């Protein structure tokens, strides 16, 4: 078996020319209590913890060779057990995705799946017990290495543990779909493999891994390996026994799979195949036939690797992990000015959320102002209440809570609050005259070096700054709601914004842990412009006569986080109307103002739906307001029209240099609108579906980018 596996991996290694190779170093230890000699395999790519350990073919070959060694030692009675652990802070984080996206043939993809299985399953076939010590971050194939071992321990300090493959467009393909449900039951496995993945790749902490039954013991991070080896000795001597509950293979298993399908349907609406392939394997894993399950994982892995959703997923992953850290067009960071105090104009909900964010991330004095004391007190009170919540959840200690509360204050007099502020952001009513007045008042009292930022969602930065003595220090700083969750920050350069203001804005964004994208001062910037064109076409077809349900269902195959009209409700119909009016003034040939939306806003409705049954149903009062024509389109016709409009708008935005490249459009939609990885944002999907060429005459991305190489 070993020779066959070695040959398989040697052939596959040629497909991964740039693999960062992980070593599998074997050392021998004398276990405590005279338990015997023990072989410990450490997975290490030779780099620090910022470069996590991964598995490509050469890395798997190294692990295979290490298993050859310990297999021989076990057979000869030289060792009593084998352990696997990782380098400091990292256990292993799965397959080498850089190599995966280079694969061009189904048989090559199949070989990668088989190679991992052939190596990992040898751990469970050794003549001595095997142990996995999850000392640090473990994801994907890293988790699966441990699942093939007989016993597992986990560190309380472990920051991230997941099987994230479905999130990317794959299945856990080296044992996860088969071994995990057979270890902890189908329902818990569905939570880890499906629910967590589709919930923005939710990670587990060490304690949760233990409580789920994935790990058999939980130890402190400071002496994790030492305690794990003591526990190992106790297991081998029979002083400690691991008792695992029986797995329910009856109706509960089928119910768990059905729950997983419900979750997948609600998240991706059948648009991405990965979750459904994983659920099929989990369903069949009920039989306990491990090899049949491994074979199914191999096939699913190969099929998905050769599909567009995975390529888009890897592209999206790279945007979020790499491009987001090196924003296109950002000026020299050395030009940034220090920020030691922040001012916030306004004390409403958005302003209060911003104050809390600046306070938590920068830990500098933050002062709010508003038009009356009651509003100021309410804003400061909101921040204090949120700090108390963090304290209650154990996220901060009492000393830090007291310190943060002491750093936030509120005043009515801008001169008193802002005379020594370095960065002042306004979050007042979305009306150009109001914002111009606010900036005029702030400029009169703020120090000369202070940056003036606006959280406007659609108004012109240049116009806002046009009446100031120093418009060069005004910058757009557009957050997305909810501020604490959505990572995008559109940094908008006005016509006169200078590099120092821009560099300071990018520096602050980094400290806020936001994904900053440089945007030209164009109406509605990026996300709101695309979403308004998208939702505007939905509203247009409804106005023309297509039933609301048909229009909504037409875009379900995209697998968006929510339907257009549910999103409108979240944003607020009044805000949606305001943005559409702004864009209509700028581009009347493409952006309309829906009379039905205007009627909904005038009637004071919060949206198109009521939720009496728990599900969205068209509000009868809204239905009575709708005035529709007699043009009824099919779902396919609606979908084509909407996607063509989006593609046309993106092409125009790129021609106008609103952002540097299509990649920035995609990064904005992923991080600002929550559009899914399987779309790659949107341009990979538009290319894959032929929409780009149909609507604009050419692709957005080069062939092979976010797609299978030719």
PLM features: residue spans?
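N-terminal glycine-rich phosphate-binding loop for ADP-containing cofactors
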Residues: 2-36, 44, 66, 70, ...
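STAS-typified acidic loop motif
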Residues: 34-61, 88
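A short, well-ordered alpha-helical element
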Residues: 55-79
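Amphipathic alpha-helical interaction surfaces in cytosolic regulatory modules
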Residues: 63, 75, 88-102, 108, ...
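Short, active-site-adjacent cap segments at secondary-structure transitions
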Residues: 89-93, 139-140, 459-460
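Conserved catalytic cysteine-centered active-site region
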Residues: 120-132
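Gly/Ser-rich catalytic serine loop of serine hydrolases
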Residues: 132-142
